[in-house]
Amino acid sequence: MASKGEFAVVDPGDASPIHEYIKNTGFHLKEILITHHHWDHTGGLEELISEYKCSAYGPSGGHIKGITNHLEDNETFHILGDYKFTAFSAPGHTNDQLSYFCKTTSQPILFSGDTLFYGGCGRLFEGTPKDMLFSMDRYKKLPLNTLIYCGHEYTESNLKFANAVEPNNQEILKAIEEVKETRSQNKPSLPSLIDTELKINPFMRCRELTVIQAAEKYSNRKLNETAEVLGVIRNWKDNF
């Protein structure tokens, strides 16, 4: 995000692109947002803090070196002066994962880190299926036109899996073609939309009968809880 000669970055795994951006634009790095502790999201943090004396917002606990502003669930803060964000806990991928939501931009935006991807979700490295379901349900409550900026470009593989779960879902087939065309032009598939995810993302659709039936067929057992469905789908994706 940039405004009036200043900018903020999310999850700088490497400081080099930030240095290059500053060199090319002359903009001042004012703030950094960190979603979770994994190295590919924090690798450039200490170098950038040291070089540019900027603020860094991220999960509380003191386990991420370089964070200057520790955030709790539902805490609000401002970026670049004008943009009001809410940090909310989104466990599953990691226990400390935060997502950042802003509705003071022209269109609502979400920085989802590695919890929610276009067409998928993050691996359960620390959390449980119940944790991830909690996070998916939080995302569902956001405005449908919310732009989702996630941590990785995994969209094509995610949609391939989503199609395996729901082969007759026309929205998934449509998304596959759109993303294929976009990526063929060497453009990012991101951002996605909450509205899109509700139609195509199996981890957002764990209460849909088609997803439940697919999970039961894969696991060869009756699934009585939605978290069980998500857990089976996640295990399926891990081995897909």
Q: Model-predicted segments: where are they?
A:
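Short beta-strand-to-turn element immediately C-terminal to the catalytic PLP-Schiff-base lysine
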Residues: 1-2, 101-103, 162
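Active-site HxH/HxHxD metal-binding segment of metal-dependent hydrolases
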Residues: 7, 14-89, 108, 174, ...
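Residue-level signal for inorganic ion chemistry
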Residues: 11, 48, 114, 152, ...
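Active-site metal-binding loops of divalent metal-dependent hydrolases
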Residues: 12-14, 37, 61-62, 93-94, ...
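Ligand/cofactor pocket segment of small-molecule handling proteins
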Residues: 76, 82-89, 94-129
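Active-site-adjacent loop/tail segments of enzyme domains
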Residues: 120-146
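Accessory terminal helices/loops
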Residues: 137-147, 156-240
